[in-house]
């Protein structure tokens, strides 16, 4: 299935449903156990590592998620460069694992793609995540 928005298209497995969360387009598997969210990001912020550090700081000084644990904030070797923020948190009796990738897509556009799965399913879902990321196209 291919999800399209004004600024991008991305492929996800058949049967996933589309939802929105603010400005983000969310695509959720039928069981509600895996999700990918895509949102436009500020292209004028070239230091994506600093961007994630600020986001984490804001999260920790606000009403952050229960059980927040940073896994890493690191450079991402994706497209025109970017950074990943990976973390875990607890919600609804589940330990969740998230990777948020901020990157420049060209044509003055930048995006954040977030991938969320239960922590105990993280490793076996990485192939799907790589396939989804490879399918991303900026418009």
Functional labels for PLM-detected ranges:
Residues 5-24:
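Proline-anchored loop/turn motifs at beta-strand termini and strand-loop-strand connectors
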Residues 18-127, 134:
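Conserved polar/disulfide-associated segments of primarily extracytoplasmic proteins
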């Amino acid at each position: 299935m291919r999800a399209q928005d004004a600024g991008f298209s991305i492929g996800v497995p058949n049967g996933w449903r589309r939802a929105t969360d603010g400005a983000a387009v969310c695509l959720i598997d039928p069981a509600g156990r895996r999700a990918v969210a895509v949102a436009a990001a500020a292209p004028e912020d070239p230091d994506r590592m600093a961007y994630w550090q600020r986001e984490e700081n804001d999260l920790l000084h606000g009403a952050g998620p229960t059980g927040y644990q940073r896994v890493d904030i690191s450079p991402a070797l994706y497209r025109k460069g970017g950074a990943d923020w990976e973390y875990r948190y607890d919600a609804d009796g589940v330990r969740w694992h998230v990777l948020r990738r901020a990157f420049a897509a060209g044509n003055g556009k930048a995006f954040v793609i977030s991938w969320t799965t239960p922590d105990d399913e993280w490793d076996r879902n990485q192939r799907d995540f790589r396939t989804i990321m490879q399918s991303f196209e900026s418009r």
